[in-house]
Amino acid sequence: MESQQGPSSPAQSNEPEGNGNPHPTASTEVTVEGPQQAQGAEEDCGVLAPTSSLLQVTERRQPLSSVSSLEVHFDLLDLTELTDMSDQELAEVFADSDDEIPQNEPPPGLQLPPFPRAGYLRSPSWTRTRAEREKKHLSDSELHGGILDTFLAAERSKEN
């Protein structure tokens, strides 16, 4: 029976050739070669490549390695600028992060009463610096306008 089924399997693969199958020989090669290349042939649409599965694993890992930790941190910074500061837990996180860097410490002899955490809300450092930057931009444009006015006035006085 095996000898009868052996010749019948190539005959079955030849029948799809007559029906217009674009890859008739791939199915016969897959059955002859073995299970490892059969998986690669199915994944590559009939092209036999013994290392195709290794290449696919590498391709799956590439998007994870293309995102650097710096990009993730910048994305988190963008998210913090858009957060609602009315959220008490989030405000405490920002207040704790500012406490790590002491800026204006009182003298050692003078001790202030501790503030309760629930009622203590301090603006995070990034909001203070952003407000200062916005003020500088406004004053810069005012300064440029003032410089232009004084320059034009000086030019007019020279012409007269």
From Swiss-Prot:
Name the record gives this protein: Dysbindin domain-containing protein 1
Biased composition (Pro residues): 104-116
Name of a matching Pfam family: Dysbindin
Region (Disordered): 1-47, 98-122
GO biological process: regulation of signal transduction
Gene Ontology, cellular component aspect: cytoplasm
Gene assigned in the entry: dbndd1
Family, as annotated: Belongs to the dysbindin family.
Bias type Polar residues, positions: 1-39
